[in-house]
Amino acid sequence: MIIDGVKISETKMERLKNEIEKIKNTGINPKMKIILIGNDYGSVVYSKAKMRRGSKLGIDVDLDRYDSISREDLIKLLKRYSQSDDIHGIMIETPVPGINYYDVVNEIPFYKDVDGMTSYNLGNLYLKNEFIAPATARAVVDILDYINIKSGNVAIINRSPVVGRPLSMMLLNRDFTVTVCHSRTVNINEITRSSDIVVVAVGKPNFLDRSYVSDKNIIIDVGINYLNGKTCGDADYENIKDYVNAITPVPGGVGPVTATDIFENFINGLKYQIKG
């Protein structure tokens, strides 16, 4: 089975659009700020995609772009936007050249943190509070919900604060059994072949080949790579798709769902601000 992330995203977009319409009918103009520093190709592409998606939802997404910025000036900018009643969500595109992202992201109030990367929002995952969660991790959970997978053994090949760590907690909150694998894990392919679900996010094209999979696997490919002028994932899609239970393609899998989940975070935070 090929899991269609575009369809999952479109279904959620309709619901979110209705929610935004209701909010706008109260006289509020939802607005989000994206801060982009440098000229990283992927960050530029993602920023423009978020602006287009926000426009479809009726959200004003404004891009602030800088060739470079000091840590002090970035913090001043974040504080100004954080204090503005007219700005309801803030995100910093990564990478941030010359600045430790985790050193500045906590300047954003938790309710305006559309990436879900402040210490407050990450910590809340441990308490089963997913009010605002990292969008990629939320997207994986959404995909499993969509295909009605409620339990099982999961191997996550990633331990980053963006994917592996928050996702492991969100899956534990749903009673999945989780194994987190990384560069020092021994015999990863034995772990993945015996798992019901494999989430791969290593940043290496075609990393997950047939030696890692079995016909019981559901493969969730979080990777986004560029190889020979084309976008591809971390899974060797063409060579494993017929040998697994189900798989998300790249593009058209996790990516569209992640992009939509950023705006679910935005709306959750906006509702919190409206309630005061």
Curated annotation (Swiss-Prot):
It catalyses: (6R)-5,10-methylene-5,6,7,8-tetrahydrofolate + NADP(+) = (6R)-5,10-methenyltetrahydrofolate + NADPH; (6R)-5,10-methenyltetrahydrofolate + H2O = (6R)-10-formyltetrahydrofolate + H(+). NADP(+) binds at residues 158-160, 183, 224. One of its GO terms (biological process) is purine nucleotide biosynthetic process. SUPFAM superfamilies: Aminoacid dehydrogenase-like, N-terminal domain, NAD(P)-binding Rossmann-fold domains. It holds the Pfam family THF_DHG_CYH_C. Pathway: One-carbon metabolism; tetrahydrofolate interconversion. Keywords: Amino-acid biosynthesis, Histidine biosynthesis, Hydrolase, Methionine biosynthesis, Multifunctional enzyme, NADP, One-carbon metabolism, Oxidoreductase, Purine biosynthesis. One of its GO terms (cellular component) is cytosol. GO terms for molecular function: methenyltetrahydrofolate cyclohydrolase activity; methylenetetrahydrofolate dehydrogenase (NADP+) activity. Its EC number is 1.5.1.5, 3.5.4.9. The keyword Amino-acid biosynthesis applies. Homodimer. Catalyzes the oxidation of 5,10-methylenetetrahydrofolate to 5,10-methenyltetrahydrofolate and then the hydrolysis of 5,10-methenyltetrahydrofolate to 10-formyltetrahydrofolate. Belongs to the tetrahydrofolate dehydrogenase/cyclohydrolase family. This is Bifunctional protein FolD. The lineage of its organism: Archaea, Methanobacteriati, Thermoplasmatota, Thermoplasmata, Thermoplasmatales.
